[in-house]
């Protein structure tokens, strides 16, 4: 028996209800496909953001928050590693790269991240599309999604008032934007990246104001007694 004539007859008899059922089925299928595609894209973006974080060293505590803050730049008040840990790690045989990462400040809703120029550019794999890398402790790179042109002077605020993580106040130390990084499709596209020495100077740790304009003051390697505590170290 051929069922198609019955289906056609039923559709003609109640075409409005049949069309509604077809539309609902099509919408459900489309939503399922869209959600699956979004989930896949989110997984890929998350994996891509974590590609260069082979090993993250932090103080004892919550490893999940350490990763969320260091890799995905979610603001949080992390415990600090003593300077001796960074000093010891940078002298470890086989450690190709040792990069401190400090996410504690913000500017105009963008996280201000202290690290090294090599880590900011992933060893040169992330291009500087406008300007150059920072070479002084009072200079900054911006991610592709930060709307600050090269030459902008900015003063970060300690904390993140939008998240109510820690009390916010503006620092007296200013940075000049000297370059813009290519897009990476990661949270770091929204970051303002400064030398870790600039972060230490802002917080009066290890590097004095007299050294912020000296290219020789930027590490690695960092001299003993010239290292401040950091929330995380990427090895």
Predicted regions and their residues:
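Hydrophobic, regular-secondary-structure patches
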Residues: 32-111, 121, 136, 222-223
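Short, charged beta-turn/beta-strand-edge "cap" motif at the junction between a beta-strand
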Residues: 147, 159-168
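A conserved hydrophobic position in a structured secondary element of the catalytic/binding core
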Residues: 59, 81, 114-115, 142, ...
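Mechanotransmission and gating elements of multispan inner-membrane complexes involved in transport
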Residues: 169-174, 180-235
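N-terminal Sec/SRP start-transfer signal
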Residues: 1-33
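Short beta-strand boundary microenvironments
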Residues: 110-157
